[in-house]
């Protein structure tokens, strides 16, 4: 009888601990979603307000060419940020079975345009963005260029956001032959920024996850970037490796299979 009582007590304690863990998980998930919605509300309003403000200034000063150009650039930067945010949300909520795009595109053009946006972001933050290597055997590929932009922009964007004025971000792109006509694109991004703790790295690819949750807004984001990166890399059969330490920067290495194409890229929509 004593042994049965002890077994029963052990089961009750184990069950109680399991319940406590489930409550902790549910509470953490609820807090993360609350933070996400609060940050999203701010991050959506901020670029919209910037765009509206810049358009109003342009309307009042149409003859001031320098001011108009400056306002246009700021409005375009805010619009790109808003579009990237919307794309991230749509990507996370897209069914995995949804067909992936198979559009001919020029990889060099896509990378240069993406890097142009990242350079503007880096300049604004006082961070030096350097392209150390851009070695491509092919110009044209078949696929969805948006996914490549999202992967690279989210990783480079985080490297800039969590850096400091005077810091640096170095990235490289190198294509290599694989098998059966498929090539591999290796993308490496390293920085000397804040880095990530071992604890955070265990769940850094979860949606809403942030090392510093109080760093929302245009500089800190809402914790979707790395979740989007992991989803896109996995969907395309790629790999991602991370080497980071708190206060010592971060190094990302992404390898993606790529299909070369002889077809001409489609013209961009106006």
Q: Where do the PLM segments sit?
A:
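Primarily the dimerization/phosphotransfer
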Residues: 15-60, 79
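Short alpha-helical segment of the dimerization/phosphotransfer core of two-component systems
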Residues: 74-82
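Conserved micro-motifs of the catalytic ATP-binding
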Residues: 95-103, 140-143
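Conserved catalytic submotifs in the C-terminal HATPase_c
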Residues: 103, 112, 123, 128-139, ...
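Short conserved segment of the HATPase_c
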Residues: 196-208
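Short alpha-helical Gxxx[C/S/T] motif in the catalytic ATP-binding
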Residues: 220, 225, 229
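Detector for a conserved hydrophobic position within an alpha-helical segment of the HATPase_c
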Residues: 232-233
């Amino acid at each position: 009888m004593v042994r049965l009582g002890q077994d029963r007590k052990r089961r009750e304690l184990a069950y109680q601990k399991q319940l406590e863990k489930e409550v902790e998980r549910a509470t953490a998930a609820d807090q993360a979603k609350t933070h996400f919605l609060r940050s999203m509300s701010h991050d959506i309003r901020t670029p919209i307000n910037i765009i509206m403000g810049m358009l109003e200034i342009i309307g009042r000063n149409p003859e001031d060419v320098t001011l108009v150009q400056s306002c246009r650039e700021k409005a375009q930067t805010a619009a790109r940020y808003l579009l990237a945010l919307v794309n991230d949300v749509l990507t996370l909520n897209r069914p995995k079975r949804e067909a992936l795009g198979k559009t001919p595109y020029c990889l060099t053009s896509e990378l240069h345009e993406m890097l142009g946006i990242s350079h503007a972001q880096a300049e604004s933050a006082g961070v030096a963005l350097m392209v150390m290597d851009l070695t491509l055997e092919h110009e044209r590929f078949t696929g969805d260029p948006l996914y490549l932009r999202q992967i690279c922009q989210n990783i480079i964007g985080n490297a800039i956001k969590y850096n400091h004025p005077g810091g640096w971000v170095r990235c490289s792109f190198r294509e290599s032959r694989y098998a059966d006509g498929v090539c591999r694109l290796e993308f490496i991004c390293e920085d000397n920024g804040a880095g990530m703790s071992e604890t955070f790295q265990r769940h850094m690819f979860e949606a809403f996850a942030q090392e510093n949750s109080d760093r929302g807004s245009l500089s800190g984001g809402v914790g979707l970037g790395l979740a989007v990166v992991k989803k896109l890399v996995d969907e395309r059969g790629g790999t991602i490796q991370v080497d980071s330490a708190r206060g010592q920067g971060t190094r990302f290495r992404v390898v993606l299979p790529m299909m070369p194409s002889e077809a001409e890229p489609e013209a961009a929509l106006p």
